[in-house]
Swiss-Prot record:
Organism field: Agrobacterium fabrum (strain C58 / ATCC 33970) (Agrobacterium tumefaciens (strain C58))
Binding residues annotated for Mg(2+), in chain numbering: D49, D88, E120
Keyword presence, Cytoplasm: yes
Molecular functions (GO terms): 3-methyl-2-oxobutanoate hydroxymethyltransferase activity; magnesium ion binding
Protein name per Swiss-Prot or TrEMBL: 3-methyl-2-oxobutanoate hydroxymethyltransferase
Gene Ontology terms describing biological process: pantothenate biosynthetic process
Primary role: Catalyzes the reversible reaction in which hydroxymethyl group from 5,10-methylenetetrahydrofolate is transferred onto alpha-ketoisovalerate to form ketopantoate.
Entries under CDD domains matching the protein: KPHMT-like
Cofactor info, note text: Binds 1 Mg(2+) ion per subunit.
Family membership noted in the UniProt record: Belongs to the PanB family.
Major subcellular location class: cytoplasm
Top class in the EC scheme: transferase
InterPro entries: Pantoate_hydroxy_MeTrfase, Pyrv/PenolPyrv_kinase-like_dom, Pyrv_kinase-like_dom_sf
């Protein structure tokens, strides 16, 4: 094999095998440049429907379309050489029937080249997940807080504080695991419950606002990088403040344009003088 042979990307099977062996690192990515920056450091890159809020200024993820997810999925795939890439099925593209879910998941995978799809839902989606997995579509499950159901769930809030919530999330996790999801996002769930799910389920859990005991963690990259400032969830740790850096850079640019300092001679093309030989 050539020393320059392209390294194979991680697969959904690789991610599943990490349970109990290594913590899974997952971040969201929506564009080629960001995917290139994150790829060397991540096991999983998620093209999340959160792009509706952090890129398009929507109040929820409900308005995101399949065409939007395909466009951003393609962009991310162009920037990835290492990580496994999963793309969200957006609201309304899989809930009607397992056949609808299959058609849209096939389109998503064929048109982006991604490694699998993510969908939200527990017991009510278990049959759909099993249907997709049996037909060759890897599924990343999602239980606990489900952003696509924000209008019926009473907003964005942590879950598992009551017996009813605990039992629902527990049943959901078991159902999605038994349906064959290769991994499961556990979102906005109290620590003891997330820990118990992680210990019980065969599939690795990837927490967001859940427990450090989860098999991995995911954050929205724009939150982690300090690019999204509309609100900051309790579970977000900001590792950079790129929003402030961008604002400061724009202000410096504006000052230099208005003062005439930019562009300077080093940024300006001049007419080349012909050489004495005429060449």
């Amino acid at each position: 094999m050539s020393a320059h042979a392209k390294q194979k990307r991680l697969t959904t099977a690789s991610i599943r095998q990490m349970k109990g062996e290594a913590r899974i690192v997952c971040l969201t990515a929506y564009t080629t440049p960001i995917a290139r920056l994150l790829d060397p450091h991540c096991d999983l890159l998620l093209v999340g429907d959160s792009l509706g809020m952090v890129l398009y200024g929507m109040e929820t993820t409900v308005g995101v379309t399949l065409d939007m997810m395909i466009a951003h999925g393609r962009a991310v795939m162009r920037g990835v050489e290492h990580a496994c890439v999963i793309v969200d099925l957006p609201f309304g593209t899989y809930q009607e029937s397992k056949e609808q879910a299959f058609r849209n998941a096939v389109r998503l995978m064929q048109e982006t080249g991604c490694d699998g799809v993510k969908l939200e839902g527990g017991e009510e989606m278990a049959e759909t997940i099993a249907f997709l997995v049996a037909r060759g579509i890897p599924v990343f499950g999602h239980v606990g807080l489900m952003p696509q159901l924000v209008h019926t769930a009473g907003g964005f809030r942590s879950l598992g504080h009551s017996d009813a919530e605990t039992q629902k999330i527990w049943r959901d996790g078991i159902a999605v695991d038994q349906a064959g999801a290769f991994a499961i996002v556990v979102e906005g769930t109290v620590e003891p419950l997330a820990r118990e799910l992680t210990e019980k389920l065969a599939a690795p859990t990837v927490g967001i606002g859940a427990s450090p005991a989860c098999d991995g963690q995911v954050l929205v990259s724009d939150d982690m990088l300090g690019l999204f400032s509309d609100f900051k969830p309790k579970f977000v740790k900001r590792y950079a403040d790129l929003g402030t850096a961008a604002t400061q850079a724009a202000a410096a640019y504006a000052d230099e344009v208005r003062s005439g300092a930019f562009p300077g001679p080093e940024h300006t093309f001049q007419v080349r003088k012909p050489s004495p030989s005429g060449k």
